[in-house]
Every structure is written in C-alpha cells, then in structure tokens.
Amino acid sequence: MRSSPLAAHVYLSVARRFDGGLARLGGLSLVAGIAACEALRGLGFGDVGLKWPNDLVVADGDGLRKLGGLLVEGGGEAAGAARAVIGLGINVRMPAEAAGGIDQPWIDLAAMSPQPVSRNAVVAMLLSRLLPALQQFDAEGLAPFLPRYAALDALAGRALRVHEGDGAWPASALGIAADGALRVRDGEGRERQVHAGDVSVRA
C-alpha cells in the first residue's frame, strides 16, 4: 500500500452539521471544490480548475493534471440534521520518490510558483473560503454556487469518455445541472445527465 509522503502536501478534514438533512448533502463535494479552487486562485494559482465531481486540476494542452481532490462522507436521518466530513488533499511539494508511484498526470503547487509555498498559508486560505461556503450551502443549497462552478469548470466543452459499468461512450461536457449532475451530449446528439455514484468521467 502506497502511503502519503510526510510533510509534503496539505491534508484537511472538516466536520459539519447540516440542518437540511441528508438531501442537503447532494452537491456538497461540488461546493467544497469551488471553495478550494477559489482559495488557491486567491493565492495566485490562477490556472486551477474543477474536474467534475471532485478533482482540482490544471489544464495541460488537451489533458488535465491532477492537483488535488475531495471526498465527502455523510450520515444522519432523512427528516433531521445530517453530519458530513469533507476531506481535502492538495499536492504541495511532491517528493521524487513518491512521484514514481503515481499512475496519472499530476502537478503540485511548487511547480506553479516561483516562490516557496507555505502549507500554513494554503490551509488558512482554504478555511477562509470553505467555512463561509458551507454555511451558505446549508442555508441556500447548491443554486447560488452554479455560476461559480461554471467559472471554474475544467471540463466545459471538452470531449469525454463516460465509463459506465463495463462499457464507455463518447460525450461532450455541457456543465452541471441544478442538482449537481454532469450534463453531457452523447455521440448521438442527446443531452444526458451523469451522476457521481454510477460513472467516472475521463478527459
């Protein structure tokens, strides 16, 4: 099992109660991704974008390099409050010995900055954007975040392959729906929606 390198990256977990119940948690990973991306842009990393549903990426020609990712775990009662833990990881300084074990294109903040990157500064900015975003999301849902996502969408207009079960089909990305699903146009020109739980999307 490959372990994460010591003192090289940012790993952050935030636990929060959501009064809207379990239904409110739909779209939470998108909101956390928006906040994280906006935080990094606020630190001068203007090329960071979002790859649906939960990756922080940087465009590299026709492809994308992964900078970080998010994971959300939640639970609670359908009619009561819910709790969720948001986990976030960002590559800051990838050690050479760790880089050899990565099987996908990646990038770290050190490669994007001429100056040393402070992990403390990254965490402080992340929390300054994430905590207010979670409060707004609990009160208002996903709707006010949709335009912010569109401004950060790294898949917009890209040709994709949607992998579903044992098969895959070509599509082009159209943005996200009101519930956070990925909107795509398939090879026959039909608009379809892809939900995070049953497919993966590869640009």
Segments from the language model and where they lie:
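Catalytic beta-strand/loop module used to bind and position nucleotide/cofactor moieties
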Residues: R2-H9, S13-A203
